[in-house]
Each structure stands twice: as structure tokens, then as C-alpha cells.
Amino acid sequence: MLVLMHRGDSVRMTGFITAAVTGAFLLQTITPMAYALVEPVEEVPEQPTYVSHVVKMTAYNAVPGQTDSTPDRTSIGAYTNPDIIAARSKDLADELPYGTVIEIVPMATTTPLDVNCGRQYIHDMIGLRVIGDAMNPRITNTIDILLDHKELVTVNGKKRNPAKALGMCKNVEIRVVGKIDTKKMPKTQTELKLALEQSI
């Protein structure tokens, strides 16, 4: 339908529209709005999952008779640092390639005492370890912790080489916690932890 408007009607219509729009705006600004209160959600960092292996554990010293002809160097040419180095048997090469950082999972208090295992004597010497050496090919499913033969421990009132005090421990759980560049081998436990953080 066609509606004819006179000039005066046009002015009145414009005024009406302006009033309607203004009224709607005022109504919107004075009408209380309902806002849903949302509690902030705290993001929990995802815990890393670690690969574990159950192995035998022994210890060695960087001295002739326990290593090859270069006791001051590991099989990959790294300095034989008793603070961070561990060796592994050849059959574990795929699971624990050089540069893998492992931790020894503490024994449960309910674990029966193994008379051939002296973990309790050297526990504070282990820390984190970098796989940086290899063992005799005949040995299987074993990690070998490099320890300082001069840092003696007390066993039954007698001072002993820590590698001998450890003996052989069976069913030891180790956990892979990272990997580092063996060409930038840390020198201390503190440096190793820092290198591990930077590699993540």
C-alpha cells in the first residue's frame, strides 16, 4: 500500500523515530543487566609421564681394571665424572641411548632387604644420572653407576669403596626423566638439573 506524506508529517515521523530510538537507549542503560559470575578456573599443569624400566644396578670406579685403557674417558669420549655418569648394558641401548637422563626410584619401605644390595649406603651419591658409558657386552639388563672410589662410605663400622658397598641390586626401578646433549655434558648435579629444565 502506498502512503503519501506531507512535509509536516515527515517532520513528525522523524521526531517520533528519534524519540523511540532515544527511549530504547535510555531504557537499555537504566535496566539492570544480569551478569553470570564465572569462577576463574585454575589451570593445573599436566604432569609428565615417565618411562620406567626394572633393571639390575651395580656401580664402578674410573680406575684401570674396571674400565678400558682410558679410565678418564667414557666409551663416548666424555669425562668420567662420578657425580653424573652411568653406564648401561648393550641390550638397553634402544631404551636408554646416550644422553638419556635417569633417576633411581627410591625403594618402598615394605621392600624386603636384599643382602647383596647396599643402596642405603650410597643413596645420597646417586642423584640423577646421564647414560654416558657402556658396559661389558656379556652383561644384560643392568645399569652401572660411576662412583668416586676416594669417597668412602661406612658399612658396619668399616670404610669401604662405595662401588663395592653397593654390590648388586636386583629389581631396581629406573625412570627416564629427559635427554641432554652429551657434547655439552654438565659437571654437577645442579648443572644437570638445569640442562634438563632447558631441554624441555
Per-segment meaning from a language model:
Residues M1-M5:
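Juxtamembrane low-complexity tails/linkers enriched in Ser/Thr-Pro and polybasic
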Residues H6-D9, F16, L27-I200:
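Solvent-exposed, well-ordered loop and adjacent helix/strand elements within mature globular domains
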Residues T18-A24:
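Single-pass alpha-helical transmembrane signal-anchor segments in small membrane proteins across taxa
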